[in-house]
Regions:
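Amphipathic alpha-helical segments used for helix-helix packing
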Residues: 90-110, 127, 153-163
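Amphipathic alpha-helical packing segments from all-alpha helical-bundle domains
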Residues: 107-133, 140-144, 171-182
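The alpha-helix within a helix-turn-helix
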Residues: 34
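C-terminal peripheral helix-coil segments that are non-catalytic and often amphipathic
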Residues: 127-130, 163-199
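Hydrophobic alpha-helical connector segments
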Residues: 70-96, 136, 146
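Hydrophobic alpha-helical segments that form the core
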Residues: 136-159, 170-179, 196-199
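An amphipathic alpha-helix adjacent to DNA-recognition modules
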Residues: 6-17, 26-27, 38, 45-71, ...
Length: 199
């Protein structure tokens, strides 16, 4: 009699990521995953007491996949641009994972403030202060505008509603960063002139 193959949590999570990349999160059920792995549902339920526990660990595992991808492209000397490009490129390269993480309620919903205050985003904002020689407040403003602009590009790439090559993605992001940095400078000049008029 052939020995039963044992599946660890790691095995199941790896196969889950492969399944989502191929078919999307909406198709993921215990039965469909078991069929994809080539086993019964027993190994899945042996590792997870219920589907919610499995989803919690899957969420972390998908974020790990995303973080590993982003890490390959980020340059701390040009943090805002490189992380924005990586975000949009991930949406193009791994649309099903991107959709799951950023276009459904699977990973939960956040306020703008909560988005700005994640560890990676705080790191990006602090790097912007050094690179662009702007205040922390201005760095947050620019980051917020660029972040959500880039998300717009990424969502269109994800659902294939726009065709952009690599060069076009880069140019769109670079131009938006420049526009927002000029906007900060203009706002500073405008406030200064307004103060003079009051005096």
């Amino acid at each position: 009699m052939a020995r039963a193959i044992k599946y660890s949590k790691e095995d199941i999570l790896e196969k889950s990521v492969d399944f989502i990349k191929a078919y999307g999160y909406s198709k993921l059920t215990v039965r469909e995953l078991a069929n994809y792995i080539g086993c019964s549902t027993q190994p899945i339920f042996k590792n997870y007491a219920n589907f919610d526990m499995y989803k919690d660990e899957l969420k972390l595992y998908l974020r790990k996949d995303y973080s590993a991808f982003i890490h390959k492209y980020v340059d701390i000397k040009d943090y805002l641009y490189t992380i924005s490009y990586a975000y949009a490129f991930y949406a193009k390269k791994e649309p099903n994972i991107f959709f799951t993480l950023f276009m459904t309620d699977f990973a939960g919903s956040r306020t703008v403030e909560e988005v700005l205050n994640t560890d990676r985003n705080i790191e990006t904002i602090n790097a912007m202060v050094k690179q662009y020689k702007i205040s922390l407040e201005d760095a947050k403003k620019v980051y917020r505008e660029v972040r959500f602009y880039t998300h717009g590009i990424a969502t269109q790439l994800c659902v294939n509603s726009i065709k952009l090559n690599d060069s076009e993605i880069k140019d769109l992001i670079k131009n938006n960063i420049e526009i927002n940095l000029r906007g900060i400078n203009y706002e500073f000049i405008w406030k200064k002139s307004k103060t003079k008029n009051i005096l």
